[in-house]
């Protein structure tokens, strides 16, 4: 008789604890898996993802110093070039609309082929689209697969040339010169009254902004108000040579700036992903332990109930 009373009390105690666990599950929105095995598999998957994001953050951090050096080096050349155009008072010429509706502007949009770096590519695509609202007939050259895929959705007819294989490493002048040569030979870039380069400018280690950089063609350079103040040989090819060099150099500057912004954005994105994965691991670890406790509780109830019936 005494053993039966003790057994009944133990049964009521275990069943009460089981009911409390069940109430806890109903109020916990994290619990989306019915079995212990599913929760365990989910937890293992999140831990594997956390390892990947942490590794990618470390890789991005090591590349960031190299990207910063490339950005600073390109910026020095850009500052010297901008000083020349400032002293020459060079500005884009006002071009009236043509009767045939021919493109008045060439847009060069620069990103890379890689993702997992936040909204850096989509933000640049939005900036290009806003610019196209004012210049719907502009021709577009995309550098990098990401910007190409973004603009193909809305402006497929404007894209005339696409270049990929960009962003694997810090850009060099040789790389930018090859791209500039392709723009001159394939797109006849020198015939456009206006050329605009769109790229991502790193404002700080945590932020960036899409920027636009104008490129002056040979005719614009030659007609600069103060261009004659410089001691230049009588060679008629000087404005053209200066334009071609400027195109390559500005491409390098934009690519270096964009590369640094992308690496920084990827590091921040992977850092946030690692933190989110850590939070999910904590939540699912609690869920796993509670689910496991519920399984043990059910087994205890079955054992005690069976013992009571046998007694």
Curated annotation (Swiss-Prot):
Alphabetized UniProt keyword annotations: ATP synthesis, CF(1), Hydrogen ion transport, Ion transport, Membrane, Mitochondrion, Mitochondrion inner membrane, Transit peptide, Transport
GO BP term, pick one: proton motive force-driven ATP synthesis
Location within or outside the cell: Mitochondrion; Mitochondrion inner membrane
CDD domains associated with the record: F1-ATPase_gamma (cd12151)
Alphabetized GO MF terms: proton-transporting ATP synthase activity, rotational mechanism
Annotated phenotype, changing residue 273 to V: Lower activity
GO CC annotations, alphabetized: mitochondrial inner membrane; mitochondrion; proton-transporting ATP synthase complex
Gene3D superfamilies cross-referenced by the UniProt entry: 3.40.1380.10
Source organism, top-level taxon: Eukaryota
Topology in the lipid bilayer: Peripheral membrane protein
Transit peptide segment: 1-33
Family: Belongs to the ATPase gamma chain family.
PANTHER family named among the record's database cross-references: ATP SYNTHASE GAMMA CHAIN, ATP SYNTHASE SUBUNIT GAMMA, MITOCHONDRIAL
Functional description taken from the UniProt entry: Mitochondrial membrane ATP synthase (F(1)F(0) ATP synthase or Complex V) produces ATP from ADP in the presence of a proton gradient across the membrane which is generated by electron transport complexes of the respiratory chain. F-type ATPases consist of two structural domains, F(1) - containing the extramembraneous catalytic core, and F(0) - containing the membrane proton channel, linked together by a central stalk and a peripheral stalk. During catalysis, ATP synthesis in the catalytic domain of F(1) is coupled via a rotary mechanism of the central stalk subunits to proton translocation.
Oligomeric and partner information: F-type ATPases have 2 components, CF(1) - the catalytic core - and CF(0) - the membrane proton channel. CF(1) has five subunits: alpha(3), beta(3), gamma(1), delta(1), epsilon(1). CF(0) has three main subunits: a, b and c.
Additional note from the record: Present with 28100 molecules/cell in log phase SD medium.
Protein name (record): ATP synthase subunit gamma, mitochondrial
Organism listed in the record: Saccharomyces cerevisiae (strain ATCC 204508 / S288c)
Gene name of the record: ATP3
